[in-house]
Regions:
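Extended, charged alpha-beta segments that form solvent-exposed binding/catalytic grooves
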Residues: 2-216
Length: 218
């Protein structure tokens, strides 16, 4: 039998004991911080039905996920924690108390080319407030405050918190006449770090051109 050389797959993380202890301490700080602000821990399955994960992502998501079949089941590894959360709330909405405040710190998987800053397996540390209808604006303001205090607890001193609001983008797309294409435009912009500003600019101007208006500086 040929000898198998041990290796770690590209884009996957393995830590030596000392670093693993440090990492676990960081995760514990996150858990304590999130719990302190009234968020409940949640752990959703790493494997979901592929149709659930692909429900709103479209073709671009299909390119990113690890997908496989087991018997008659079409399955996939979760690529984020948001879609599993949506499924969880839809499934258990009659048993939950709203606003539902949850946190989840778990691994997610992306079937894309590994490169600097982009892994195939990595952790996400999410906090979300799910309302039964509309949420108070204080919930929006609370999240950056929690992030600030959590980063401070981790010992970070120099960091930026970038805030965005989907309503601002929706208003911009309405002005540009791109309401029906909003999802495609945002998925293109989301590739900024992956493919670079020049390619993003080319896609925006070639595929989503608006007469008399350039998207180059948006």
């Amino acid at each position: 039998m040929a000898q198998i050389k041990p290796r770690t797959l590209s884009g996957f993380m393995e830590l030596l004991p000392a670093r693993q202890v440090q990492f676990d301490r960081m995760v514990e700080i996150l858990r304590k911080s999130y719990s302190l602000y009234g968020f409940t821990p949640l752990d959703t399955p790493a494997i979901e039905a592929a149709e659930v994960l692909l429900a709103k992502g479209g073709g671009e998501t299909e390119k990113q996920i690890y997908r496989f079949t087991k018997g008659d089941s079409d399955l996939a590894l979760r690529f984020d924690l948001t879609v599993p959360l949506a499924k969880y709330v839809a499934l258990h909405q009659n048993e939950l108390t709203f606003p539902f405040r949850r946190f989840q710190i778990s691994k997610v998987y992306r079937g894309e080319r590994a490169q600097k800053g982009r892994y195939r397996e990595f952790y996400q540390a999410d906090i979300d407030v799910i309302g039964d209808g509309s949420l108070n604006i204080t919930n929006e303001a609370e999240i950056p405050s929690i992030i600030y205090k959590t980063f401070t607890a981790l010992g970070l001193r120099r960091f930026k918190i970038r805030v965005n609001n989907r309503k601002v983008l929706n208003g911009l797309f309405a002005i540009l006449g791109l309401e029906k294409q909003a999802g495609d435009v945002m998925r293109t912009i989301d590739k900024l770090e992956k493919i670079g500003p020049e390619k993003v600019r080319a896609i925006l101007t070639d595929d989503f051109a608006v007469p008399g208006l350039s998207l180059i500086h948006i």
